[in-house]
Amino acid sequence: MGPLQFRDVAIEFSLEEWHCLDMAQRNLYRDVMLENYRNLVFLGIVVSKPDLITHLEQGKKPSTMQRHEMVANPSVLCSHFNQDLWPEQSIKDSFQKLILRRHKKCGHDNLQLKKGCESVDKCKVHKRGYNGLNQCLTTTQSKMFQCDKHGKVFHQFSNTNRHKIRHTGKNPCKFTECGKAFNRSSTFTTHKKIHTGEKPYKCIECGKAFNRSSHLTTHKIIHTGEKRYKCEDCGKAFNRSSNLTTHKKIHTGEKPYKCEECGKAFKRSSILTTHKRIHTGEKPYKCEECGKVFKYLSSLSTHKIIHTGEKPYKCEECGKAFNWSSHLTTHKRIHTGEKPYKCEECGKGFKYSSTLTKHKIIHTGEKPYKCEECGEAFKYSCSLTAHKIIHTGKKPYKCEECGKVFKHSSPLSKHKRIHTGEKPYKCEECGKAFSRSSILTTHKIIHTGEKPYECEDCGKAFNRSSNLTKHKKIHTGEKPYKCEECGKAFKCSSILTTHKRIHTADKPYKCEECGKDFKYSSTLTRHKKIHTGGKPHKCNKCGKAFISSSNLSRHEIIHMGGNPYKCENVAKP
């Protein structure tokens, strides 16, 4: 029994028959033939394009084509259209001869002719104005075999046999590899390619191979760019009918796929399948490199880049490369200044959705992250993580250069710049560079002269909030920073830190020129002038210059002619 061919579903006209059809009938015929051809191509049945299809696509008459092989000389004249028709018995006889010729092994008894058109004269479609002969041929030929059990009609006798298997419930084709069974040998053959990895269908355009011809046919649309499936609601076009079906649910709001576990509904069955893994914990996608498993194929694809080290996404602006396209998209906003994520409450824009999410907490006042140890709540998860270290006392971040440890990674990153000398934050006004962005922000105030921090007690203004905080202690007399060694108290933590060196003899400031160590950075700065020979402090009276301001002050007493330091206990002579 031969496979299904285009000629099995095609009807051809002579020139005389073609002229009997009006324009609507011709268009209908053309649409049906082209649709039949496309369906066969989709199923991978048609390899080369028939001449009939070429003529129809070009809008030509099918007059050059030979009439279908089963058509004999007409013997009856149609009274409606002056068209030659066969008597009904001639139709049946001709079809039976053709079927027996093509299905010799089946036997005459196994073939049941479907009575699709009892009489040519009684054919309803013919009376409505369609070609009676070809309608009868189409009706008779397209549904030739009938199932005795359900009355279902089939095009070929082989389809009848396939259908009968459904009644028996048998799956004669079973695969030993996975135990899966099939009721058709063709489905069984296709399934085997999953295990063998065979991909016999190759795209001529790009070389990509597929294990099914239907997949290749679908793939080819990528190269042609054809989008023949159009949405009637919005006009959007798609290259696959399945994509159009999925798209239509946007307009209808339909979500037919419901999760039995939690009741959540979805537009697509594939999304439901993926969603179910949340409940089952299934992770079907495994990395061959390290064995790690993933719930989603996309997550595995993203993970694989870790092993290859590939960074295929490159920024055209600065040349920086990224593992993922999403990271490149996010990075580009640095150059464009784009802030697509806008707060509906205050209108402020953000580059990243995560930043907007954090920002929204300002308006809600929500503190969703709570410490289990002490109950303190935080706005951000990172703040909670940082807080937890207070309870553990751990300092997990260690400087490899000097061994200093930190509770958080960010202070370690800043600390490392002391060793590297890196100063990535540069002032556009004067070119001065800084190791921290906060220091640059503070520095910029020098150029603007702005002093936004004002003391409520005396009205004095400061360009830094830290300076205002220190100043306020003058009014309060507060000295919160106490030395554990000697009990001395200080207004500022920095002064306490400096003071502690008296007890420890720590000299962290080293001269690169001679290696001498100093307790204070100011002392090191003065010392460096010995090597440079610089004397920036000049006397206005005589022009003599000094290395330090204190030396200048002592010198100026000479010009004053006085002895400013007088002992009150010494008696006058």
Swiss-Prot record:
It is found in: Nucleus. A zinc finger (C2H2-type) spans 145-167, 171-195, 201-223, 229-251, 257-279, 285-307, 313-335, 341-363, 369-391, 397-419, 425-447, 453-475, 481-503, 509-531, 537-559. Pfam families: KRAB, zf-C2H2. It comes from the Eukaryota. Signal peptide: none annotated. Its main location: nucleus. Gene3D superfamilies: 6.10.140.140, Classic Zinc Finger (3.30.160.60). One of its GO terms (molecular function) is zinc ion binding. Keywords: DNA-binding, Metal-binding, Nucleus, Repeat, Transcription, Transcription regulation, Zinc, Zinc-finger. Residues 4-75 form the KRAB domain. One of its GO terms (biological process) is regulation of DNA-templated transcription. Disulfide bonds: none annotated. CDD domains: KRAB_A-box (cd07765). GO terms for cellular component: nucleus. Belongs to the krueppel C2H2-type zinc-finger protein family. May be involved in transcriptional regulation. This is Zinc finger protein 66. The gene is ZNF66.
